[in-house]
Amino acid sequence: MPSYMAFTPYIMFSTNYAAIAYILISRCYRDSMLLDLQRITLEVNREMLRTGKKMNSLIRRMFFLKTFTLTYSCLSYILAVLVYQWRAQNWSNLFNGLLVNISLTILVVTTFFYFVSLMHVARGFDFVNQQLEDIVSSQSMDLKKKAHELRSLWALHSNLSNTARRINKHYGPQMLALRFDYFIFSVINCCIGTIYSNSDQESSFEKFFGSLLYWARSVDFFLNDYICNLVTEYQSQPKFFAPEGSMTNELSSYLIYESSTRLDLLVCGLYPVNKAKWLEMVASIVVHSIMLFQFHLVMRGGYTTLFSRTYALLANIITLTMLPIVMWQVRSVFLAKRHYPQLILITNDIRYTVSFLIILYTLLSRGFRDTALKEMQPLLLTLFREEKRCGYKGIDGVRRSLRILLFVKFFTLSWLCITDIIFLFYSSDAVIWVNIARFLFLSNTNNILEMVPMGYFLALWHIARGFDCVNRRLDQIVKSKSTRDQKELQHLWFLHTCLTKTALNINKIYAPQMLATRFDHFVIGVIQAYWGAVFTFDLSTSFLWVVYGSVQYHVRSLDYYLIDYMCDVAVEYHDSARHSWSEKECY
């Protein structure tokens, strides 16, 4: 794994731990719900045995496929430890690896229980539909017996609907946590898998094993969404087989009940679980994986291979060609939603025009920024070497105020990127290729506007970190009596000079980009402030959307303010006053 991506396992394992902790804590609620499921499953089995009905072939194939993906994933986790840790012949590492990977199987096994629970519910709904069709088309059954069978099916259908809602309610927070865990797993492994697939250090067997495990987990999680979609479909399946001549009061009442009872399986009330949302999540995974891969290409030192140069060229051409078309389609969808005041439409056009121009300049000027990042690398190596020699090791050796600045900036950046993705995720009405392409392009381009200023911030943050290291070490040298410490003044002088030159060069290269970004932030800030007032007071808007827009506006303002504040911090550390020095210490 590249050294600059060493933090990704911490993110992935932290997410895994949070999901596993919630699964284990909430187990008692699921166990009580599974007891109710067992009773209704026995009832469905008894009715199917009485009538001679069998399980639907589609449900049976899904169950076999889910069992295969579960078995393969669990065995792969355990066998991977036995194969790779056995070579080292270290029992401590073998035990730790087994403990970790057996814990990871909890994430897969728990979704299997969710799948099996909904599979039994879908099987019950399918039996109700088959039995209802037989009752309606039967000529030998009298009306009294038909009425009795209809009442039994009605009661079974109602129990199945209530059980499905209970399953969704108890498993909702857990499936939300597991969905986030799978999202992080997919983004990180997709990016790292792409990097390793072009590497010669790993064998073909390891690449094949990793890709097969990745796709097995993807299919395994897809089946969870598909079974939810199947339950909803079977619960309200159209009854075209009921002719008007065979309609009775009981049958009419049942059909009215079934058509008016809709089963919406929402995860924590946030979004429906179906194939449509699955495809949108896959599109989001692709967007974030591309963003991580772009970060990898930049951090490895620019376009050094034909593959990376071709990728960057094609990505820029496709983005600049398709983005105006996508923005025009978004404008059409925006107009079709509801009737807006004319000034809202004008400001919306201004906002998209400015954003496109900024993105155009950002992509065209990428080579200059890559040059600045290349010049930062030797300086960073020198800075890390000096920090290690002075006793300031790693991130813990950095001043606390600088660490807080970095963490807050990462939080605002992550918030803006993730919330923009979620907003676009929920704004799609139907899953068609146009909406998926629109989602991909808008997600990627919105991230461009947020990620490019982050490079400027990180460069200034490292420069401020270097100036602070020089200042702290200089205070120690001045107060020291050792001649060895006093000889370090030349090293500090050289480091201070390099930091100053690099800061001036980065500011020169990034100046047009930051001027364009400032104009973009100014336009978006003015327009969103106006929109916030209009949507809050003049138009009927949900309270949650008002809160979301307000928080988004203030987080965006804080995100940009941190860039200006970082410039002030770098200048302050460069010109740090030496009031603590006495005249005797100056020589």
UniProtKB/Swiss-Prot annotation:
- Where does the sequence pass through the membrane? 5-25, 63-83, 98-118, 278-298, 310-330, 404-424, 519-539
Q: What is its main location?
A: membrane
User: Is the keyword Cell membrane assigned to this protein?
Assistant: yes
Keyword field: Cell membrane, Glycoprotein, Membrane, Receptor, Transducer, Transmembrane, Transmembrane helix
Taken from the record's topology, the Cytoplasmic segments are 1-4, 84-97, 299-309, 425-518
**InterPro entries named among the record's database cross-references:** 7TM_chemorcpt
Functional description taken from the UniProt entry? Probable gustatory receptor which mediates acceptance or avoidance behavior, depending on its substrates.
Q: Which GO terms describe its cellular component?
A: plasma membrane
Q: Which GO terms describe its biological process?
A: sensory perception of taste; signal transduction
Official protein name in the record: Putative gustatory receptor 59b
Look up the domain of life of the source: Eukaryota
Extracellular-side segments: 26-62, 119-277, 331-403, 540-587
Q: Glycans attached where?
A: 159
This protein's membrane topology, according to the annotation, is: Multi-pass membrane protein
* The keyword Glycoprotein is annotated on this UniProt entry: yes
Hey, which family's this protein in?
Belongs to the insect chemoreceptor superfamily. Gustatory receptor (GR) family. Gr22e subfamily.
User: Where's it found, cell-wise?
Assistant: Cell membrane
